Amino acid sequence: MATFTIHQRKLGKDKVDQINTDSNSDMANTYFRMGLVNGDNVDELVAATFDHDIYRMTTCLQVVSDHALTVIFDHMNGHTCDDVHNEIVLMKRPSMSVGDIVTNTGSGTSWVCMPFGWHELGMQIETKIAA
């Protein structure tokens, strides 16, 4: 059984106000680009998104499967998955979509959900739950 965390782009009122005030700001462009991410510079874009404090850890899952990313994607999109053994929802979350990050807490490996499939990141994602 492996434990995974899911980070999703979640904007508080202050970030929404910043985007509405200046939709061409670096933070706004980073947020929008992450929702349309393609194969170019994914690691740099993810790092910038964390720098702008846009990602939030929303969920922790324990999964038993050789196809954990598929199971997680299906589960996060409302499909019943017998391979998900435990779920901790840390905050209200949307379904899984492009730009969301899944991290295996044991190996430290992270993947970004892409328009088609997954991109393995070459960077470490913080998986500690803040007190």
Predicted regions and their residues:
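Intrinsically disordered, low-complexity segments enriched in small/polar residues
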Residues: 5, 29-30, 48, 53, ...
